[in-house]
Amino acid sequence: MAIALIATFAYLLGWSQIFTVKTIEVLGSPNALSEVDILKMSQVKIGGQLARVNTQATKENIQEIRWVRDVDISRNWIDGKVQLSVLARDPIAYFNIDQVEGQTIDNQGELFVLPGFSNPELPVISAATSAGALEANDLFTAFPADFRRSITSMVATASSSFLLNAKLKGRNIKIRWGDSAEMNLKISVIDRLLALPENKKITLIDLLAPHAPIVR
């Protein structure tokens, strides 16, 4: 009797049309285009058996999408709903878009292209070499959030040397940043220089020697 009940239950879960996927819901997807990516990578199909939806495998499939930061999968045995909840990465800058169209980075330094995403207010980071790109990425994501938001573009001009364009106190300022050392000191120097009345018309700050900055 017990064996028969187990066999019947196994049949209902694995083969019967009672416990099938009736709806698939995507939560947290930034837009319709990115939702298509989620559905495709999940490999979950309407009409498929709920018992055969491997939540761990589905999660791993979706996490292959670069713009996905985290994902959670759930099944509802009563209404047949499979819910795909994703946490998308938040772009903080465009990165080498001349090489990869629409490529962005987040505050963890991850590179990704978010389908359908466009934000002309995001800064643009450029680097000629892969090493320069990694260093630019590390420096940019290490900046304090308020200073990072002031940057409109960033270029790795040479090995460990960077040029910034920023909007500071309502002014467009070009900053020869130098290497990534003494970040807090350099930001403090910028603030002090811009506060001086005699510097109200400057457009360039050279921080190659932060203890002896040059303004023009």
Where are the model-predicted features located?
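Extended, alpha-helix-rich binding/interface surfaces that flank or overlap catalytic cores
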Residues: 26
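Charged, solvent-exposed interaction patches on well-folded alpha/beta domains
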Residues: 1-14, 19-22, 35-36, 40-49, ...
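Glycine-centered tight turns that cap/initiate beta-strands
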Residues: 67-70
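Short helix-loop capping/hinge motifs at secondary-structure junctions, enriched
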Residues: 31-33
